[in-house]
Every structure is written in C-alpha cells, then in structure tokens.
Amino acid sequence: MDKTALQLRPATVRDVPAIDRLITHYAQLGIMLFRSHADLYESLRELTIAEEAGQVVGICALEIVWADLAEVRSLAVDPGAHGRGIGRRLVEAVVVEARRLEVQRLL
C-alpha cells in the first residue's frame, strides 16, 4: 500500500489536535463554529478522517439526528489540499455509512 495515497478512516484520539487545527482555521474565517476539545472527544466516533502521508488533510462527520435522519457535519479540507476531491470523497464515505446504518434521509 502506498503510504502517501489518500486514506479514509475513522478518527482516533490522536487526531484531535489536527481536527481542532482544521476547525479553528475555518472558524476564524467565520465558516465553521469553534468546538472545544471536550466536544471533539465526545463526537470522535462520528468523524471520518482523510489522511495523506501521515497528515490529516480533511474531516467529515455523520451525525444521526433521528431514526430516519442524519446530517453531514464538520466537513473541512486543509487549504493546501483543496481542489483534489478530498471533500467529495469524505462526503461519499459518510453517505455509505448512512446507508449501512439504514438512515433514510441525509442532510
């Protein structure tokens, strides 16, 4: 396996500093809301990570809202990795997860 190729995987506790860095970057631009580390740890199981060469280059969360409804949240891609389809791949991954969970509607 090529260790520099983009990999999608579930988030781990080691990812929280990188997740915080991405969210803080976009929160400072007024695009996302700031999140505390406590909130990030609480929602860690909802997050999918895009990793390349050992670096987190994107995040996306799937939050189950109700029995038939889920929401795509916290989609963020490192500015240096824009234009490469990373956000699209992250959304596709959470859509697959929503289907696996038999969620009928996705926002």
Positions of predicted regions on the chain:
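Conserved N-terminal entry element of GNAT/NAT acetyltransferase domains
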Residues: M1-V13
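Short glycine-enriched loop/turn motifs at secondary-structure junctions
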Residues: D2-T4, Y41-E42, E102
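Acetyl-CoA-dependent GNAT
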Residues: P10-P17, R21-R73, D78, V91-E92
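Conserved acetyl-CoA pyrophosphate-binding loop and the N-cap/start of the following alpha-helix
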Residues: A81, G85-A93, V103
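Conserved GNAT acetyl-CoA-binding A-motif
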Residues: E97-L107
